Amino acid sequence: MLWKTALIFLCWGLTSGELQNGLSATPAAPARRTLDFGFVPSGVYDTVAYYEPGAIGILFNMMHAFLFVVQPNPFPEDLVISAAKDKFGAIQSEYQKVIYYELGFVVCAALGLLFTVLLPLVGLLFCLCRCCDNCGGEMHQRQRKNADCLRGLLTTLLLTTTFIITAGVLCAYAANQNLSSQLKGMRRLVKSNLKDLHTFANQTPAQIDYLISRYGTVKEQVLHDLENVGVILGGRIHEELGKEVKPALDATLSMTGTMRDTKDALENVSLTLETLQEGTVKLQANLSVVRNSLRNALNDPVCVDAPAPEICRNIRNSIPKLEIAANYSSLPDVTDQLNKVNDVLKTDLSQIVAKGIASFNDTPAMVTAQTRNIVEGVKVLLDDIGNNITSFSKMLPVHSSLANFTRMISHTHSQIEDIYPQIDQMDFYRWIGCITLCCMIVLILTFNFLGLLCGILGFDRHASPTTRGCVSNTGGNFLMAGVGFSFLFSWVLMGVITALFLAGGNLEKLVCEPFQTRQLFKVLDTPYLVNSAWRNFIPGYLYNDPEMDLTAYSLYSNCKDNRGIYSALHLDRIFNISSFFNTSVYSKDVSRKFEGLKVDLRGIILLESEGKVNLNNFSETGINEIDFAAYLEEVNKGVTRIDLIDFANQLDAQADQLSKGTLQTSLKGHANTIRQIHIQQVVPLEQSMSTLNQSIRLLERTSSDLPLRVEDVLKAVDDAQNLISYNATFVINQETEKYKQNIIGYFKQYIDWIRTSLALEVATCKPLSNIVDTVEILGCGFLLDSMNTFWFGLGCCTLFLLPSIILSVKLAKFYRRMDTEDVYDE
């Protein structure tokens, strides 16, 4: 049922894949935004598939170290694969490799079997030997000088051996108890794993529903772009066409400024020319009066006496310079040109250009109006896609399949709960058996400790062997009892230990360690191992497609990383559901809808004929016929031939050289008069000349290329108009394609998000890897490590029973009461 559920996810993934193919890559419109689909709701898995043994881990490490010494060879991957392929026939043909790998186990097992077989025989022979008063059976002890030293050495060695055996039995007991306690923890692990499977099954429908519901985000954004098609598509068309239209309109608009500037300049020329003509006449008259008055003043008799004659002569020679320099009366007026410009300005070109700009700026509205039917068609298509997705989701038995899967989990849980009592009962029997084995050792240890205790406490060094006390004798008997039980139990213990060692050691080396190093997965993933016709057994079993690149290790690793079962099981390779949800059809449908888009911009008039006539009239106003050279020549002459202020200052200086009198006073009066003329008449005329100069130069610049400028403006406007009216198809198609791809891009984002979600977030298969890890924890961590540590501790005890037997027999001689002793005559 689980794989059926997984196949459902595949359907959604392939659906998204085919739509993505239809959304081919074209330059995306800048208006596209990244959609936010939110976060897929996810459950929380409780299982923590990690085992930390705690303090007993030290014993586990000792056991592992012992197994490494016994079996240091690497995992025989090739041998295992050959054995599996040949149904263990390879073992017969390659027995040498098997023996080489198992050599450590074989040697240890052989020693164990030898121990098991020989020890009862040795014990029997030992008993018979002692019955014949041999092998220490004679109740006679020879007196030796080093008896005390030997007794102390034997006591120390036996005590050390006994402590070692005690440590071993404690190790075995701890392992036995750990196994029972961990089996109780097994229930928690199993329960959490089954709970995670419930979470997996319960959250999956909600996740799928969430993926489906996020189509609303796509639809909402697409509707937004469709409803704003004028702003988006029309704006882009407007922007692209504006690269040629705006410069043309700006140039036309700048001509209106040129017209106004030309009018202002002509008016300035006309006014300043009239002002200059009138002003120079008045100035000429005033200067003539000053000249005549100065000549009359110089007729004064003072000019006869030295040094006045020289001064008067200089003044008289400079008087002719008091006259105007420019003759503005000869300059032609610009009335005709001004009148023509005024006639041109009667037509408001700026208003005409504004109408053209407004018409061009109406492009978004025109696009909105002309694409209304197409937009409505795409909206209907959106609804159809949504209906198809909804109907397709209803076709899939997601809820029913997952409900069956949930019931299967519940049934499995119930069955597991039913066998818990049997497991507990079996564990109890196992525990009893292990405790019995430990008790055998404990019984021997008890006799050893009691024997040592009674022997040490009851020993009297002054007593002869035949007169030893009851306590000392009892200690010796305890030691011999321990020897007897050692012979009785040790071969049984060694037999059990050997069997457990062979089974547990090989399982540890051939299963648990390879699982930790992931070599076991390499074996499982060996091509044609499980089935000679299947390259990979998982896809061969699930999908009957053994060539699919799906291995046990890849499945485990993906689930370990908590990826979705969709990607872990490579479900995108199973079904072709084009007949259900062929997304490329949708992209073609969207493209087909936009193929009928025809945006006609011929209604846009950038510059009406009246405006063109107006521009032509402006170029024919005749400002280029003005005699700019004559104007500039007169302007450059200045107002007067000589600077009146300088002349007045010189006149004052010359008057100061004369003696005081009427002539000096008259000359100074004339100097002041000249200054007044300069201030009141020359300065205003100079300002008018400056204005005239600026205006003439402006008109000269304007007229120099006016016809060419007008021609360029009209050509630019005509070119822009032709682009809009006849050649805008390329721009419209280009921007329409971008807009269309923008719309399709939202679907692509949705599909990419679905793919990513299916791969990483939907139906994450962590519970599957947790189950594998849990089996490893239960089998290797809980069961095998504990059992291996049990035989390791018990084996240590059993081995040290041999020195314990020897030492106990020898030490018992020093504690038991003898029947005879050596007697020496004095």
Swiss-Prot record:
One of its GO terms (molecular function) is cholesterol binding. The keyword Cell membrane applies. Glycans are attached at residues 178, 268, 286, 327, 388, 404, 576, 582, 617, 693. It holds the Pfam family Prominin. GO terms for cellular component: apical plasma membrane; cell surface; cilium; endoplasmic reticulum; endoplasmic reticulum-Golgi intermediate compartment; microvillus; microvillus membrane; plasma membrane. Keywords: Cell membrane, Cell projection, Endoplasmic reticulum, Glycoprotein, Membrane, Transmembrane, Transmembrane helix. Its main location: membrane. This is Prominin-1-A. It comes from Danio rerio. The gene is prom1a.
